[in-house]
């Protein structure tokens, strides 16, 4: 799965969870050893993306890591507001 596919996967997962889908941003920072994906959503949607006790965020992170396992680089995923 390519880097762009990882970004598309995140957007596809997060879009139904938020009230402001136009404010979804996935920022990719890539080095020789890792791909860092940072998700930004509207301030009022942050809690929805994180979920109770972080369960939703953990599920998103698990899906992203599973999709990125074919990459030779380590995949890092963060949510920020």
Swiss-Prot record:
Record keywords: Cell wall biogenesis/degradation included?
Answer: yes
Per the record, a Pfam family? KH_KhpA-B
Give me the segments passing through the membrane: none
User: Mind naming one GO cellular-component term on file for this protein?
Assistant: cytoplasm
Residue intervals of the KH domain:
34-81
The record, for InterPro entries, names: KH_dom-like_a/b, KH_sf_prok-type, KhpA
Q: Which domain of life is it from?
A: Bacteria
Q: Where, per UniProt, does this protein localize?
A: Cytoplasm
One Gene Ontology MF term: RNA binding
Q: Which UniProt keywords apply?
A: Cell shape, Cell wall biogenesis/degradation, Chaperone, Cytoplasm, RNA-binding
Name one process (GO BP) from the record.
Answer: peptidoglycan biosynthetic process
User: What is this protein for, i.e. what is its function?
Assistant: A probable RNA chaperone. Forms a complex with KhpB which binds to cellular RNA and controls its expression. Plays a role in peptidoglycan (PG) homeostasis and cell length regulation.
Which family does the similarity line name? Belongs to the KhpA RNA-binding protein family.
What is the annotated quaternary arrangement, including any partners?
A: Forms a complex with KhpB.
- What name appears for this protein in its UniProt entry? RNA-binding protein KhpA
What organism does the UniProt record list as the source? Bacillus subtilis (strain 168)
| Gene name tied to this protein | khpA
């Amino acid at each position: 799965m390519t880097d762009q596919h990882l970004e598309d996967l995140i957007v596809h997962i997060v879009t139904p969870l938020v009230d402001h889908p136009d404010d979804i941003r996935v920022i990719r920072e890539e080095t020789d050893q890792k791909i860092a994906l940072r998700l930004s959503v509207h301030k009022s949607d942050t809690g929805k993306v994180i979920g109770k006790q972080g369960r939703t965020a953990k599920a998103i992170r698990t899906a992203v890591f599973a999709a990125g396992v074919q990459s030779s680089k380590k995949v890092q995923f963060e949510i920020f507001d």
